[in-house]
């Protein structure tokens, strides 16, 4: 017999009033009654069906004839193990204990719903062995799918005296009950209401004490099966204080490794992390949440790492995320953070050594706690994360960081502090800066509510000092701490803090201000980009880099954001960069003075530190505003130091890093960098390194070959583009009446000049490697017009050739004074009052003065 239909959802449990009404009678519902005879359904009449319970508490389905209400068409008792099937929306089919197949076809689906609710009520209260299932066709139309609405449920034994037989039967039942949602839900209800887990834990201790391995493995499989039920309430109940050790103890036994067991309890108990209160928690509920959070993570990441499927893993992760959100919310509204920050307010320590040691340890634990809280917040959405980080900054996060980086000697703790600040600035690079601005704005607004102009003032000194403090802390750590792990984290933090992308301050947008500036600088025919914001691009004095109050009050919102970023980076080059790049600014970059055994001696500088600094040089030159970064780099002779590192007695990794830095600056196609490096003969160490490795198949040779490849590629592109544009612009004039042909060669003349210079100066070295195709092309391109010196002179907009003198070591040296003065113009912005600046060496001052004199003579 098969009557296809569609199921309904399982009825929800009824309240007492509903149950009382159903227990008497249901409302009559119009139906047709069918009886199966000879494999055919016979219509026995139409009537009204009710569910009733008589005085003897026997339940019946009764159908009265529609035409003769006193005549009964059907009276079927709900008894035994009868299975009622709901098919489609309006059909109930069953076979009574006499073997008769009966079907009720309801006029409306609501009538069918009413009688199904009656059957559910009877099963729960009178006849527990009857059942009601829905039957629907499978998706492919072949066969049918059953789903239980109500029925008898077989449950595990909760007897305190468990044995192998009862455990094996329980495991079988638990696995079978996962096949239907109804059975699964009833089993979950049983687990939670009957303390079945406590029964299992109790027997586990007995089985372990009596060494019954079969029971131990059965218990482990039972607990894993309960975890697979994927029910939050079950998981949370397992990690409660009185159960967690028993649960992880049971899970130490695994049938995949029957001869060994894990030591989860030992880890949690003695050696593992314990719940430590740095600051006493007043909220007991929060303690419970924190413990649950850790224990669930321990289960997910350690105990069950090989066992969990995606559904279980995601559920535990969601629970942990919810608990972490509760913890973060509590920290923001309570006094806990205030009491924690107070640990770092005073510099005085307790007098007794024991109390002093405890206090110092408490401060270390406080840093660990903050780092854990910040890591927790990573899973929050962006708005909630920003809110929490701003709360930390306002509460006094910098007090903690200041202690960690200036007073704490444990490198592990300092790494945690660095990780904390990295996480914050990676989320929003200007969050700390903006918090200080917001707080200062609120103070000004409160103190002068009627002064409209005060609402637009910028707390430059306050916010700048905050930004400088963070950058200075990180720079000091990089220069002074020799821990490789800490250095890597600090460099990561500096890269994030100094990256211009996304420096809008609200954490929601992206405004690549510096990148745009560099793009304009590279694609404009002017000496400097059209990027002023109230500044004279040809003469920038960073020490006087600020707006007047009237200008500040008239800034549009976008301009305010742009100014904020410009102020941020100008402040960096003014105050932090001279310290951060100090080892590269000093005249002797290979050694430094240090105190050894009470005496001041020269020691070799840290090559690993120099690698980080050279990478940062490359970073600021390529990512920051060209005007700001170029002025600092050239005025402080940093490229000279980078070039020296290529030829010094340093590790190969540092030498190649310096080569890559020179290569990156060359690729910027910036005429000021090109002229500076040619005039200072900074390519000589590159060719020395090439000579050392010219016949070797190694990384150094490959790196320098790539250097040459870039040059000839750009020269070819220039020749191709120049030829095409020359044809297109022949006889054309610009808006000012100037012949366009005169500007055809402006785009890539830097590389053609460089190629000719290298061929003229280091041709002998290059000819030793003519087997490399692009080196041969360099020679051919550089020597094409070699006899005609005017071509080389005109390519740099001048009339005099670059004089090249051979030094005793076989490498050429150039003289800046031999270059046409008109070609030099300004290698950087105007320089004012630099004689007394401690960051400028004598050579740098002499170089600047010579350039200024040449400019003055023109």
Swiss-Prot record:
Cellular-component GO terms for this entry: nucleoplasm; nucleus; protein phosphatase 4 complex
Keyword Nucleus: yes
MF terms in GO: protein phosphatase activator activity; protein phosphatase regulator activity
Keywords annotated in UniProt: Nucleus
Disulfide bridge positions per record: none
Basic and acidic residues composition-biased segments: 441-453
Keyword hit for Chaperone: no
GO BP annotation list: DNA damage response; meiotic recombination checkpoint signaling; negative regulation of DNA damage checkpoint; negative regulation of glucose mediated signaling pathway; positive regulation of double-strand break repair via nonhomologous end joining; regulation of double-strand break repair
Residue stretches of biased makeup (Low complexity): 1-13
Gene3D superfamilies reported in the protein's UniProt record: Pleckstrin-homology domain (PH domain)/Phosphotyrosine-binding domain (PTB) (2.30.29.30)
Span list, region Disordered: 1-23, 441-463
InterPro entries cross-referenced by the UniProt entry: ARM-type_fold (IPR016024), EVH1_PP4R3 (IPR055236), P4R3-like_central_dom (IPR006887), PH-like_dom_sf (IPR011993), PP4R3-like (IPR051137)
Coiled-coil annotated spans: none
Pfam family, one: PP4R3
Record-annotated membrane-spanning stretches: none
Subcellular location: Nucleus
Described function: Core regulatory subunit of the histone H2A phosphatase complex, which dephosphorylates H2AS128ph (gamma-H2A) that has been displaced from sites of DNA lesions in the double-stranded DNA break repair process. Dephosphorylation is necessary for efficient recovery from the DNA damage checkpoint.
Quaternary structure and partners: Regulatory subunit 3 (R3) of the histone H2A phosphatase complex (HTP-C) consisting of PPH3, PSY2 and PSY4. Interacts with SPT4, SPT5 and TIP41.
Miscellaneous comment: Present with 7010 molecules/cell in log phase SD medium.
Protein name: Serine/threonine-protein phosphatase 4 regulatory subunit 3
Source organism of the structure: Saccharomyces cerevisiae (strain ATCC 204508 / S288c) (Baker's yeast)
